[in-house]
Regions:
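Conserved glycine-rich cofactor-binding loop
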Residues: 18-20
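Conserved glycine-rich Rossmann-like NAD(P)H-binding loop of the short-chain dehydrogenase/reductase
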Residues: 32-49
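Conserved NAD(P)H cofactor-binding loop of Rossmann-fold oxidoreductase domains
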Residues: 94-99
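Substrate-binding pocket helix/loop in short-chain dehydrogenase/reductase
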Residues: 102-104, 110-115
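Active-site helix of classical SDR
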Residues: 126, 162
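Residue(s) in the substrate-gating loop at a strand-loop-helix junction
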Residues: 146
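C-terminal helical subdomain
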Residues: 186, 207-243
Length: 265
């Protein structure tokens, strides 16, 4: 059990803060007495959450409405916080989305936006906020990946590739940052109850109907515990952990075929 922090309060920045796992992280950090910087594309929802959480938890909440598919957004977020003298102690790179379909038929611009949000933005924000953490000698970064990171994903090829990048990137910099006081955790949830599947168009797939998915609150709680303990890789659910390890021992071609069968409608 983690005790709510005492003064001075630390500040957590959470991207994709208005829904799903991101919203549950917002609730968790607020309940542990963190001031919040919430980033999301949904400005109206941001304002509503900021006002409600300020009153409920008596914390400072800064809302920043940004489209993270725009390449200048990470720098704009960083500069806005610098100007406001808000220093980030915990960075939660949660924002992301997926696209379903055959690669030769999916929309290129949508996939480039996805690469920007899922991959480039995480790299950019981490680069911007990490330096101060290292100079201070403390800080935490949580990057949200997926069990998709552990194998190729036909029918969601670009999405799976971005999640593999997040896993590899996070593990590498976690190693680089040993003995600095800064930890990096990568959260790799399996399919989770959220609006993600509606956006990808997979909510009515047989896979989704047959699968017992974790709820976002449980996933966030497991990720939060792992982050606070300084774990590098966190995979919620025993079944997900077993599957993530099992693919290492199978031929890659076979793993890819199985992945395609699972993804298929």
């Amino acid at each position: 059990m983690f005790k709510p922090q005492t003064q001075p309060r630390k500040t957590a920045l959470i991207t994709g803060a208005c829904s799903g796992i991101g919203y549950e992280f917002t609730c968790l950090f607020a309940s542990y007495n963190y001031n919040l910087v919430l980033v999301d594309i949904n400005e109206n929802k941001l304002i509503e959450i900021a006002e409600r959480f300020t009153q409920e938890y008596n914390i400072c909440v800064t809302s920043i409405a940004k489209d993270l598919s725009i390449s200048t957004s990470p720098e704009a977020i960083y500069l806005e916080l610098q100007q406001a003298s808000i220093h980030i102690d915990v960075l939660v790179n949660n924002a992301g989305f997926g696209i379903y379909g055959l690669f030769n038929e999916t929309n290129l611009n949508s996939e480039l936006d996805m690469i920007q949000v899922n991959l480039v933005c995480i790299t950019h924000l981490t680069k911007l906020f990490l330096k101060h953490m290292v100079e201070k000698g403390e800080g935490k970064i949580l990057n949200v990946s997926s069990t998709a990171a552990f194998q190729p994903g036909p029918l969601m090829s670009v999405y799976f590739a971005t999640k593999s990048y997040i896993l590899s990137f996070s593990e590498a910099i976690a190693n680089e940052l040993e003995d600095t006081g800064v930890s990096v955790t990568v959260l790799c949830p399996g399919p989770t109850q959220s609006a993600f599947h509606q956006r990808t168009g997979t909510e009515n797939s047989q896979r989704m109907k047959d699968m017992k998915m974790m709820d976002a609150k449980t996933v966030a709680a497991i990720g939060f515990r792992g982050l606070m303990k300084g774990k590098t890789v966190v995979i919620p659910g025993a079944k997900n952990r077993i599957l993530a390890e099992a693919v290492r021992f199978l031929p890659r071609k076979q793993v890819t075929k199985i992945s395609k069968a699972v993804q298929g409608h």
